[in-house]
Amino acid sequence: MRKSYRVKSEKDFQQVFESGDSVANRAFVIYTVEKTENKHFRVGISVGKKVGHTAVARNRLKRYIRAVIDEEKLRINPHVDFLIITRPYARDFNMIKVRKNLLHALALAHIIEEVPDEVEEN
């Protein structure tokens, strides 16, 4: 995913946190803000130390999330900035579980249209 598709600055993160709407499932919290002037969506990803105690684990989860976003970018509303906050429940997720749970959360936030049938439970 190109860097132009990322929310990077602290100012932008705070703007989405403070003025955005949020939805959540057990694995992810999604904050969204409509940006009609955007040519494409922008996403910020946060994986805290409670989720993975090592940088390797946190970076693996971020890599999985970015891969799902990259695969689904044509289905994502282009006029939105959103943040994906990972919860500790997602600590041991593999790529398949990340995909199912993330698509469910994105559908709840109306970032993508279709809601997957079910969310994988441990």
From Swiss-Prot:
The cellular component terms of Gene Ontology attached to this UniProt record, alphabetical and capped at eight, are: ribonuclease P complex
- State if Transcription is listed as a keyword: no
Which UniProt keywords are listed? Endonuclease, Hydrolase, Nuclease, RNA-binding, tRNA processing
Q: What class of enzyme is it?
A: hydrolase
The record's annotation in InterPro entries points to: Ribosomal_Su5_D2-typ_SF, Ribsml_uS5_D2-typ_fold_subgr, RNase_P
Q: Where is the signal peptide?
A: none
User: What EC number(s) does its UniProt record assign?
Assistant: 3.1.26.5
Question: Which one of the record's GO molecular function terms can you name?
Answer: tRNA binding
Catalytic activity reads: Endonucleolytic cleavage of RNA, removing 5'-extranucleotides from tRNA precursor
Has keyword Transmembrane? no
Choose any GO biological process term that the UniProt entry carries and state it.
tRNA 5'-leader removal
Please explain the role this protein plays, according to its UniProt record: RNaseP catalyzes the removal of the 5'-leader sequence from pre-tRNA to produce the mature 5'-terminus. It can also cleave other RNA substrates such as 4.5S RNA. The protein component plays an auxiliary but essential role in vivo by binding to the 5'-leader sequence and broadening the substrate specificity of the ribozyme.
PANTHER family, sorted: RIBONUCLEASE P PROTEIN COMPONENT
Q: Which family does it belong to?
A: Belongs to the RnpA family.
Relate the assembly described in the record: Consists of a catalytic RNA component (M1 or rnpB) and a protein subunit.
Q: What is this protein called?
A: Ribonuclease P protein component
Gene name, Swiss-Prot/TrEMBL: rnpA
